[in-house]
């Protein structure tokens, strides 16, 4: 998957979980309910935590050809994006958070191309 496709996929997913009313409410509900219900914890992991991380790890593994490095690269890439969900929820200027997301991806993928 090319860098542009990773950026496009990531932004679409971020907007899905933040700007679509049902998905945003579902994400917030999963965040709370993961501590009360094992099924909700599993959904939270699949949709927002380990699921996206594993997906990105597989992409980076194919690009890098190194499974060990792919895991760390996926953590480095997805960690800030995961944090941006919370920042988005509390932000008055939501467009600024989208800009932060785009800047993170541009910087990260540019650094990856250099190394």
PLM features: residue spans?
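Alpha-helical structural segments
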Residues: 1-12, 43-58, 99, 103
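Hydrophobic alpha-helical connector segments
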Residues: 1-23, 70-77
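Helix-loop "lid/cap" segments that line or gate small-molecule binding pockets
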Residues: 11-18, 27-36, 108
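Hydrophobic/aromatic-rich alpha-helical bundle segments in the mid-to-C-terminal region
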Residues: 42, 50, 60-112
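Short, polar/charged, Gly/Pro-enriched helix-capping and turn/loop motifs at alpha-helix termini
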Residues: 20-23, 91, 115
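Amphipathic alpha-helical packing segments from all-alpha helical-bundle domains
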Residues: 19, 24-25, 31, 38-65
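Short amphipathic alpha-helical segments, especially helix-boundary/capping motifs
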Residues: 2-8, 30-35, 81-83
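Alpha-helix C-capping/helix-to-loop hinge sites
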Residues: 12-17, 37, 63, 84, ...
């Amino acid at each position: 998957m090319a860098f542009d496709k990773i950026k496009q996929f990531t932004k679409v997913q971020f907007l899905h979980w933040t700007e679509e009313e049902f998905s945003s409410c579902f994400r917030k509900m999963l965040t709370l309910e993961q501590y009360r219900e094992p099924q909700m914890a599993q959904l939270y992991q699949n949709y927002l935590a380990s699921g996206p991380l594993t997906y990105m790890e597989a992409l980076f593994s194919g690009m890098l050809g190194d499974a060990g490095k792919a895991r760390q690269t996926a953590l480095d890439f997805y960690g800030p994006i995961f944090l941006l969900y919370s920042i988005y929820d509390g932000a008055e200027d939501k467009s600024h958070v989208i800009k932060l997301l785009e800047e993170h991806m541009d910087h990260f993928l540019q650094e990856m191309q250099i190394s």
